[in-house]
UniProtKB/Swiss-Prot annotation:
Top-level taxon in the UniProt lineage: Bacteria
Protein name: Biotin carboxyl carrier protein of acetyl-CoA carboxylase
Keywords in alphabetical order: Biotin, Fatty acid biosynthesis, Fatty acid metabolism, Lipid biosynthesis, Lipid metabolism
Subunit annotation: Homodimer.
The species this protein was found in: Chlamydia trachomatis serovar D (strain ATCC VR-885 / DSM 19411 / UW-3/Cx)
Length: 164
């Protein structure tokens, strides 16, 4: 059996939707199989730039027809808890927020502090790696929106800044 015959067999398998064929003849054994799952899966990589415009905040479902008081109460509570408008420093990755370099050390920044673009404002731990987060803008820190040790998502608001 030569290569041309094997190619013809492969084409015939495709036309007839055959998954597997085994041929044994005159000391030759040939086994062809289609659409098999690979034994090793390729790793999947995600480009975080694709998610840059997405918000991590979820909309609160409303039930206007039923007048559900729990939903109305949660909407009113959510609106009152919403941080004031302004410029925000956001988390560049998913991890755990730390406001100081160690538990005993003072916080990197506090409300009222002035920051520049290169000022380290916090650390986000991801997979046991401590990643310094820089302000990326100049201004005065108005509010810290998260507490030490809290988990953060990509794009979570960390600090409210009034630009200088």
């Amino acid at each position: 059996m030569d290569l041309k015959q094997i190619e013809k067999l492969m084409i015939a398998m495709g036309r007839n939707k055959m998954k597997r064929i085994v041929i044994k003849r005159e000391g030759l054994e040939l086994e062809l199989e289609r659409d098999t799952v690979p034994s090793i899966q390729e790793p999947v990589f995600y480009d975080n730039r694709l998610f840059a415009g997405f918000s991590q905040e979820r909309p609160i479902p409303t039930d206007q027809n039923l007048g559900n008081p729990i939903v109305k109460e949660s909407i009113e509570k959510k609106e009152s808890e919403a941080p004031a408008q302004g410029d925000f420093i956001v988390s560049p990755l998913v991890g755990t927020f730390y406001g100081s370099p160690s538990p005993e050390a003072p916080a990197f920044i506090k409300p009222g502090d002035t920051v520049s673009e290169d000022t380290v404002v916090c650390i986000v731990e991801a997979m046991k790696v401590m990643n310094e987060v820089k302000a990326g803008m100049s201004g005065r820190v108005e509010e810290i929106l998260i507490t030490n040790g809290d988990p953060v998502q990509f794009g979570s608001k960390l600090f409210r800044i009034v630009k200088a």
